[in-house]
Amino acid sequence: VREEVMAKWTPDKVFEASGVDEATCLQVARTLAENRPSTLVWCVGHTQHTIGNAMVRASCLLQLALGNIGKSGGGANIFRGHDNVQGITDVGPNPDSLPGYYGIAEGSFKHFASTWGVDFEWIKKQYAPGMMTKSGITVSRWIDGVLEKNELIDQESNLRGMFFWGHAPNSQTRGLEMKRAMDKLDLLVVIDPFPSATAAMAAMPGKAEDANPNRAVYLLPATTQFETSGSCTASNRSIQWCEKVMEPLWDSRTDHMIMYQLAQKLGFGTELVKNFKMQKVRGMDEPVPEDILREINKSVW
């Protein structure tokens, strides 16, 4: 925390920005300073705010300044704000880990090759040379993967395609740059029960110099949690099974059906579902959710 930056935040400026008066601000500051270690906990009020990224970073900086990081009773702790956010995090969407938070080293891939029953060399061939064990780009920095000069990016080409799967950029702080990046893509896919803010942003008119006339945008309707069954994991890692309430509406499909159909088109559908029973849903093959959970349990617990 730089002193010259903090010096600008006088009590009147804090009140102007936050609505918290000087007396209350001083009381909170004194309470935090005199009761250490302490933990800071937040949910979607922080993360899905219009400046969510900045607020989370500020929270971490506050805890660092107070000396509350890395000790029992301290920490900057986020509670999951929606149903099964913990569950999806557990199965490996982060750019620097595999399911179960295994690192992206060859040994981890060999573990999954063994538990999935697929050949490690086959997995290796699915990646460009050197990319299998290299961290990807985070959700808040994919913009740079499109807009930065290629020599500043640790891969052969800039990003050309993006999938927004159950995610919208409302809480990202770089909206104008994100719009430019979206317009430059070759492919943009939005998978959600409803057209999201991503779809709305993609449809907004942008600058002519940023527009890619050959860009393809696809909206794939996914089911809600009521139109499928599956497990939900809470912040405390407890697991609850949720049963299907109704059949999928209109043209919507479950996430695992969409994944399977994409894998078929890309040539590895057989490998993806080799450990799953398949069931028919509206005449289409879909992996049985219970089998997916069994494979997760076998692989990461």
What are the roles of these predicted feature ranges?
Residues 1-72, 78-301:
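Non-catalytic alpha/beta scaffold blocks inside enzyme catalytic domains
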